[in-house]
From Swiss-Prot:
Stated family: Belongs to the periviscerokinin family.
Purpose of the protein: Mediates visceral muscle contractile activity (myotropic activity).
Domain of life: Eukaryota
A Pfam family of this chain: Periviscerokin
GO cellular component, one term: extracellular region
Location relative to the cell: Secreted
The name this protein goes by in its record: Periviscerokinin-2
The keyword Secreted belongs to this UniProt entry's keyword annotation: yes
InterPro entries: Periviscerokinin
Main localization of the protein described in the UniProt heading: secreted
GO biological process: neuropeptide signaling pathway
Residues annotated with Leucine amide modification: 11
Entry annotated with the keyword Nucleotide-binding: no
Length: 11
């Protein structure tokens, strides 16, 4: 959620 990346949406 913080990173905004599709691969790591929860980071």
């Amino acid at each position: 959620g913080s990173s905004g990346l599709i691969a790591f949406p929860r980071l």
